[in-house]
Amino acid sequence: MKALFSHYKKLHLWLLANLALLSAFLLARRSRGAMNALTEGFTNPLRRMLGRLCECVPFSVSEGLYVLAAMGFLAFLVLGVRAVVRSRHRSGTVYALVLGLGNAVLTVYVLFCLLWGANYYADSFTDKSGLAVEPVAVDNLERVTRQFAALVNEYAGDIPRAADGAFAGDRAEILAYAPKIYENLYEEFPFLEMTDVPPKTMRFSRVMSAMGFTGFYFPFTGECNVNVDFPAATLPTTVAHELSHRRGIASEQECNFLAVLACLRCGDAAYRYAGALSGYIYLANALYSADAERWRAVRETLDERVVADLRASGAYWAQFEGLADTVSNAVYDGFLKSYGTIGVKSYGACVDLLVAYFK
């Protein structure tokens, strides 16, 4: 064992450093104060700085890194196989290759924990805002769902429509407006204030759709990235959702709530409509689970233009139902649970916040 350690000393020291940092994080995350200090004093400012640097690049640096990582992994496999075949000590070569790959993956994970994972254990939006969330009564759920149905009907006529009645807003204009989305929330929630930049569009948006993703925040570059292939009616809330992550909000449910609220409060028609539509979808899904008859009664009040957008979205996402979508959701569900959230289903928990705020 000693000889093995000595022969691959650098790899083992790298492993020990990774394990030491990971252990320190796992211990420190038990302290809310330590996580607040880490996120507010170091990682959040660092990610914002990285985001400003990457803003100078016209394409998504995040996407470029994913492509490079995939190419690097393939090159590693090819060169690794060749090294094993040519080696006189194949078991040792395999050991070194596996240890090196494991170290690389562990280093990325440790950095992710520090740059982003700490936000799961720091003060949340609910903690900072003081918004009280209580169990949702069905009557209150129905009342707020009706409010959002009325809002989405009201805003449906404010945006351009295609021949089939579906949303036909300009994606470029939606993305360009992004830096202004949160401005009207700063007075009520001053801790959200920061300078925003438009999100980056993904060239592999179709691949994202196949995996069930509409956007993601990449902490290593500080970039917000959005899928631009899916129907654009809810693109504004996707943009707002990712920008809330940029503010250090880790919880998916809180980001969904903030996206709806920011869109409703902003001055752009496409964003207001998307906020009302997304809010209605979250609430209506919850109402359907609680009382299908009440859901049907609310559903019948929807404007045909709203129904056209719901149908367009349903038809688009139906084509991606399959193995890739199932696997990616299972992986992301496991990721969320590893940080103490309740998994992918926590997206629906934003209903509690919507009802608490709008009832």
Write out the residue ranges for each language-model feature.
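N-terminal membrane topogenic signal
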Residues: K2-L15
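Membrane-embedded alpha-helical segments of integral membrane proteins
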Residues: L19-A83
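Active-site recognition of the HExxH zinc-binding catalytic motif
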Residues: P58, L235-N256, V260-L261
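Transmembrane alpha-helices and immediately adjacent membrane-cytoplasm interface residues
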Residues: F73-V78, G92-T126
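Membrane-interface segments at or immediately adjacent to transmembrane helices
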Residues: G117-E187
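Post-HExxH zinc-binding segment in Zn-dependent metallohydrolases
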Residues: D139-R143, A250-R294
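Auxiliary, metal-adjacent structural segments of Zn-dependent hydrolase domains
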Residues: P160-G222, V228, A232
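Pan-zinc metallopeptidase signature
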Residues: R305-K359
